[in-house]
Amino acid sequence: MGAGQSTRSSLNKSSPEELSHVLAHRFASKCFTPLELTHFKDNFNSRALDENGLRHWNEEILSQFLGIPDGAGEKAGPHTDATLDAGPVIFRMVSYLGAFPFQNTLAPSVLTYEAIIKVVVLLTERYGRVLRRGRKDRIKLLFGSLADVGRTQVEEKEMPVQESNDGKANGIAKGNPSHVTGFAIDAPANDDEEEEDDDDDLALAALESLDAIEVFKHDQRIDRSVYKARVSIDTFRRLIALILVIAPLHPIGTTSKLIADQDAESIDAIQAQVDSIIAAFGEEADNDGITYKSFSRVLRTSLPFLFDPLTPLFEHFLFSKNLDLSRRKESRSTEPEHEKSSSTPPPHSPHSESVFLPGPFESNILNTALLSHLSFFLSTSYPLPNLFRNGTRLHPVFSSVYHGESLTAFSHHVLTWHAPSILLLKGVTDSSSSRQDTVLVGAYLPEPWKQSSTTSSDHASDYLDSSKFPCLFQLLPTHTVLLASPFFKTLKFNMPVASFSTKSGIALGCMIPPSSRTSLHHDLRPRPAGGGSLIIDPALENATFVVSDGLNGDGVFLPPGLSPSSSSSFSASALSSTTSISVHAIEVWGVVPTQPELGPVLDPDSSRGDAVAAQKAAWDFEAREAERRRTIHLKVGGGDSEEQTGRALLEMAGIIGDSNYSPRKH
């Protein structure tokens, strides 16, 4: 017991640099396996620079290792695309995160072994193995690594005030003037934002694990009110462009290959998605940058998986080509020339397979950039929601370009798909002005179209599984996500998630008026309800996308920026924005979540995995029935008289004609 108190006392007297060093080694021992740590050390030591005994990485080494473009590097040339030039942004983030949990006083940090250890732990979310109180929430930490902030300057006149509060902490600061002064982004703010009160949970948990809370309090004592921290639009734009490209990346994948595959058309598609995501931050995107309040709100409600691709990117540190055991085994049993061909990482991985399953048509809407955009917010499985991480596959179900603009064709293909699906609609704004903007809207539907969502079972686990909740979204021109109401399963029967008929067309999130003999045609039109809705006319030529500013009565979807957990605090509003769309294409993609990493135990609904086979069986049955109905056996008896009687009956029924009648068999 005495030894424990002595250790706690010595840690409280340690400098931030010493505590940061201790935390890094605790991360290394608790968050990595011995094999992973061996690979990490080899990657670091084989590339590190040595300056007066200090081994570290610089920006160029980091960018080359991660395989990301770096305009500041020696290999930058005239053909280097500035859109994907995220090397300086990543280096800036890493330099900030390497100072954790003392970003105020130690950032930007030199990329030493200890600093990069902490960066990898934070960006791969492995800190839960050490920081029990730490929320799995990196939003503020990531904001701080991206924000443009002034350097903290603690003037002498502020010191007496600080000493009156905690002389011991200031004594540590005075006794250690050698470290560089850091950023002010994580200092306590003089604001009334409730959600920022616990934003330092990760840092607090880190210092609690070291029994060094007093040092942490000193690091957080600098007033942030004089700093207007914002994320530069240019900085954020370059980061989003990179994340869109590397979204399909897996830990042993090749980042440089994903980037090299981008041609001019792909770059244009990426820029369109970047503009859409930036526009989601509202007027701030056109002014001085993005504030923390907007950054946190948008990421929490409509882009929860935006930074997921950084996890496999930084897991590259845990795989060294020099220590690849598979290469060594091959080199012993093959010729020397084969050894060269085995220098690439293992090509087989569930994440490297194509997301698109083979089918009758290729998409006129979906591309790689759009698929990456969908992965930033769409939850297709549980507990791994990201469609690139959980092995989700998309099966082509319906295309208006391929199958025709007909509700009959739509129902034939959609009603035979008994699994979750994604509806996508692309068109242009139908306005009187000469300018027509491209519009792309869609919806994720966890239940088959044939079954009403109001009849689905309501299990307690469904509230934890976001893949069981529908959502309505817009990808162009502005990223918008309308999450499902937590009570959407208990709504009245006339408020289904999705419905369609030959009279009213396709309706998502609408109230469907009851039909009767006295009802006029306009009385049967679906009516927008809740936070938003999508209505497509029966001809599949025009659509209406409605987004409400508040809760417009009961409805399936919530307004943008509102999550199910906070829906009760949102005020009602009758104001809404309506976008009229001239439809160019409609597609429905079946979601086939296959989780090879987790096995079928976590996904007991095996019918979802067999949806492709079930649809094919249904179509084969329909084809056999159609052929059977076309083949009419005229010989109903043993002689010609019975055959003639059967023919006469069929003629009277109007099924066949008598122009080619002959008593003989053909």
Swiss-Prot record:
Chief location: cytoplasm
Short name of one Pfam family: TLD
Residues covered by region (Disordered): 329-354
GO CC terms of this entry: cytoplasm
Subcellular locations according to the entry: Cytoplasm
Comp. bias regions, Basic and acidic residues: 329-341
Matching InterPro entries: TLDc_dom (IPR006571)
Sequence ranges assigned to domain TLDc in this UniProt record: 364-592
Domain of life: Eukaryota
Keywords annotated in UniProt: Cytoplasm
Keyword check for Cytoplasm: yes
Keyword set includes Cytoplasm: yes
Family the UniProt entry places it in: Belongs to the RTC5 family.
Its job: May be involved in a process influencing telomere capping.
Protein name: Restriction of telomere capping protein 5
